[in-house]
């Protein structure tokens, strides 16, 4: 049986790092599917899914399939079935599969596809997602891209599958900026780097001659703000990723640390260290370079992070003794403490969904990554150990990335964990790595 094109819709995707991708929606089933994943019910049994090698004239089809499978498996929501168990060999991805062959191996969803080279040198990637027990096609799309951009196509396909089966946006077509750490501990070289969310395509964006820390993406993904010790004193800089151009964010007399963009990208919030040892939170409007002081305490106020709607800011302050989490209006009004547990809290970051705040907690000799509701209730620790720090949210608010350093020799490594705390994965990087920051979805 052939599945014809029911509806065609072209969309164009641009990226600062990739060529144009055009996508066409070719077929969808009714809105209610037999197979779906309810990601709001707590602990979830991963969905068995069969992902066949995409037909191609070379190894590229298999490579794309491997990236898709790895993305979905790493989310903890999917269990890709071993290809050795497949009964049917897909020879025509345009035709409906033999659903009974896939039901026998309990493949509740099936992905088929094809990669072909076009006369202009571009690649055409097609895929279809099937509900095997419902006997229907759920989604079908095709993409055009340059050969060197094949990994991004794989991530986009994985996002489409994730969204169709969970109802939530995926997070695979994203990047992470982080601090790459190389060399011996006494002479550690720290460079800013960018990679795909799965650790591939690492690119360095600083040379390591000056210590650089706390990189953070702008909402449009075109800029990074970070702290550099160039000249011996920490200052906040703004780096244009496409051109490499950078500029100082505010020529303050003291040290500036912990920068982060506002949700609209028009401001940077940061902390300014005072001569008396205190630190207060300031914003700089990037349009006119005006600064506004938000806190005026004798304490250390730092680690500010906006709510997704830009109306509130969460930050760390030791004004009550130990470092705790506080929330205030974006104009500095009505500061109130929200963390009430034992220990010290730091590195708060607001979820893109607006419902949770992630943080680092130090208590009883351990560092934990946790989340709480925005009023401080419902605190949950997701992972604990010798040193876990610096959570950053995936753009769908379902997964966190952080860095961990084990006791003894060695250095920090990057990990992801979901909100159940059960699905923890290491992200492979060329060297030691710390202080990650997740980008929004690419476009």
Swiss-Prot record:
Alphabetized UniProt keyword annotations: Cell cycle, Cell division, Periplasm, Signal
InterPro entries in the record: 6-blade_b-propeller_TolB-like, PD40, Tol-Pal_TolB, TolB_N
Compartmental location: Periplasm
Primary residence: periplasm
Family annotation (Pfam families): PD40 (PF07676), TolB_N (PF04052)
GO terms classed as biological process: cell division; protein import
Signal peptide range: 1-33
Gene Ontology CC terms, in alphabetical order: periplasmic space
NCBIfam families associated with the record: propeller_TolB
Described purpose of this protein according to its UniProt entry: Part of the Tol-Pal system, which plays a role in outer membrane invagination during cell division and is important for maintaining outer membrane integrity.
Family to which the UniProt record says this protein belongs: Belongs to the TolB family.
Subunit structure: The Tol-Pal system is composed of five core proteins: the inner membrane proteins TolA, TolQ and TolR, the periplasmic protein TolB and the outer membrane protein Pal. They form a network linking the inner and outer membranes and the peptidoglycan layer.
The protein, known as: Tol-Pal system protein TolB
Phylogenetic classification of the source organism: Bacteria, Pseudomonadati, Pseudomonadota, Alphaproteobacteria, Hyphomicrobiales
Gene name in the database record: tolB
